[in-house]
């Protein structure tokens, strides 16, 4: 029986794919320094990646690795919490609504664009 704390051999490949995708995502995130912008861009890219007929390895590299390190939930929540602590409740709620609305919208748009590139026999 395999040790549950020890990754299986094929999991190493998956971990490397995520790591290789995460490095450029983190570098872009570090340069942009705008939570709303990176979250919206990341949602659009992730929607596209999910919509396109990519192999799971590419989804790990681009979706989990790149988009996962590009986007930020914790910084967004800190920004909202800071607004709330300053008494700017409406601004915090606006930021939450704007980020979620734009994120869902561009993710759906990216998915629909990617879906158009699927062969007709592949889930279309």
From Swiss-Prot:
Pfam families in the cross-refs: CRCB
Coarse class of the protein's main subcellular location: membrane
Transmembrane segments annotated in the record for this chain: 8-28, 34-54, 60-80, 93-113
GO cellular component: plasma membrane
GO biological process: cellular detoxification of fluoride
Keywords: Cell inner membrane, Cell membrane, Ion channel, Ion transport, Membrane, Metal-binding, Sodium, Transmembrane, Transmembrane helix, Transport
Keyword Ion transport: yes
Membrane topology type: Multi-pass membrane protein
Protein purpose: Fluoride-specific ion channel. Important for reducing fluoride concentration in the cell, thus reducing its toxicity.
Protein name: Fluoride-specific ion channel FluC 2
Organism: Prochlorococcus marinus (strain MIT 9313)
Gene encoding the protein: fluC2
């Amino acid at each position: 029986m395999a040790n549950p704390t020890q990754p299986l051999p094929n999991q190493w490949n998956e971990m490397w794919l995520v790591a290789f995708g995460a490095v450029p995502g983190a570098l872009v995130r570090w340069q942009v320094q705008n939570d709303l912008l990176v979250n919206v861009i990341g949602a659009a890219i992730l929607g596209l990646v999910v919509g396109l007929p990519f192999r799971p390895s590419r989804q790990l590299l681009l979706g989990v690795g790149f988009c996962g390190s590009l986007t930020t939930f914790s910084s967004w929540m800190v920004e909202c919490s800071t607004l709330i602590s300053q008494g700017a409740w409406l601004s915090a709620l606006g930021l939450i609504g704007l980020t979620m609305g734009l994120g869902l919208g561009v993710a759906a748009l990216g998915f629909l664009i990617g879906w158009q590139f699927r062969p007709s026999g592949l889930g279309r």
